[in-house]
Amino acid sequence: MAAIGGDGRMPMGVAIEVKGLTKSFGSSRIWEDVTLDIPAGEVSVLLGPSGTGKSVFLKSLIGLLRPERGSILIDGTDIIECSAKELYEIRTLFGVLFQDGALFGSMNLYDNTAFPLREHTKKKESEIRDIVMEKLQLVGLGGDEKKFPGEISGGMRKRAGLARALVLDPQIILCDEPDSGLDPVRTAYLSQLIMDINAQIDATILIVTHNVNIARTVPDNMGMLFRKHLVMFGPREVLLTSDEPVVRQFLNGRRIGPIGMSEEKDESTMAEEAALLEAGHYAGGAEEVEGVPPQITVTPGMPKRKAVARRQARVRAMLPTLPKGAQAAILDDLEGAHNYQAHEFGD
């Protein structure tokens, strides 16, 4: 594992290069030919309707599931083709926050958090204690280390799971629906915590979520799975100003669009919905935001997020290739330098 730099922060996390990835369960194709580069040291979000294989994708990235085609390059190693020993070593780069926290019910929070250190390192118990207490303090659980998972709230279990994901100083952090089971207030706290962690260790973070507010305000990059394919992946500014129908529908939580209750809609259904909309029928959904919603910033006193400058440089290079309307909205955002913290922008 890389050493901490002179500014007290870990070096930038590593990139993840996915090429031509295809996964099936028996005769059921989950997704095919998925290709994307997840930038190092940035926060990315993967969106998509239920059943599109987002969690399957996450599990594939750490080698828990094996796609039948394609490659996943992490720190120069293809984890699909590498040996079991190489995969074991690559996994030490990862910290994973599972959807349910995945805590051991028979262990208190201290032992749950210490588990990866005892399994993957030869550190003395005194060293383990220092690390565990530091991570629990980081996620706001200092003083709760003797409590058991059954004695605490769902939000606290999420934070305990995040503390455990951080104990090996990972360069890549995967979060599987971190907001699942949380109310909007706890979700806002968790969003702020993720941004603060990225500022401190510059890790590569990938979040799978259905939460529209997280999608709009947290990530540097966004991607969306639909119809067994990756529809788009890129900087937040590009997707938030995109006219791609499925992206617009999902980000605004509308019924009107290609996504149906259980499957994609046919053209006649979409035409009927469009007619209802033109007739003044209110279709529900989230408040539609014009332009680019501001991104959550770090808590005052934290280091600046290096990811912001890297992403904005890529966006400026892409501007000439984007539609005029998107260019104007993105330039307004870049020049306006919109910044806020999670508690200032709720659901």
UniProtKB/Swiss-Prot annotation:
Q: Give the Gene Ontology MF terms in alphabetical order.
A: ATP binding; ATP hydrolysis activity
Q: Which CDD domains match?
A: ABC_Org_Solvent_Resistant
Say if the entry is tagged with keyword Nucleotide-binding.
yes
SUPFAM superfamilies per the record?
P-loop containing nucleoside triphosphate hydrolases
Q: Where does ATP bind?
A: 48-55
Q: Which InterPro entries match?
A: AAA+_ATPase, ABC_transporter-like_ATP-bd, ABC_transporter-like_CS, P-loop_NTPase
What are the residue boundaries of the ABC transporter domain, all occurrences included? 16-252
Instruction: Tell me one Pfam family matched here.
Output: ABC_tran
The yes or no answer to whether the keyword DNA damage is present is no
Please provide the record's keywords in A-Z order.
ATP-binding, Nucleotide-binding, Transport
**What is the recorded function of this protein according to its Swiss-Prot or TrEMBL entry?**
Not known, could be involved in the transport of ribonucleotides.
Q: Which family does it belong to?
A: Belongs to the ABC transporter superfamily.
Q: What is this protein called?
A: Probable ribonucleotide transport ATP-binding protein mkl
